Amino acid sequence: PHHLGSLGYRVGIAGKVHVKPASAFPFENINGFDPNCVRNPTQEHNLNGIRSFMQRDNKQPFCLIVALVEPHVPWVMGDSSKYPPSKLDLPPTIADTPRTRKDFSKYLAEITYMDGQVGEILNTLKKTGGEKDTLVLFTSEQGSQFPGNKWTNWNTGIHTALLARWPNHIT
């Protein structure tokens, strides 16, 4: 994204931005997504800022980074009742205790909440008419925040997601 501005792109970022100095990241800040990852509860998101950014100039390409804070401790977003702790199959890297089962339930609820946000963002892109000619990348920053996962060199700590969607280019 650093070099896209000089190539004629509008570059914007919404959500979690933990970079300094701001002058090294010449992105337009877009409101609507919580920049704080440990607020309880996380602020509800609002799509108006990204919708306005996407629609501003149909002739100029854009790069929009939406840095979602979910899933992140304290895992307060979403409906954890959909994931009863006693019925969960825990990954083998997570200790099976009542506390980890309860926490994993909240973690899954936040992932579901985040998935809903991604769907709303994609729907906003579709409504603005940019769905067919926009490369969408989805990635995560680290493994889950369970003991032995984040902050380790094991696969559960460093494995991240990367999904790409670009109609008629990537299948």
Regions picked out by a protein language model, each given a short descriptive name:
Residues P1-T171:
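Formylglycine-dependent sulfatase
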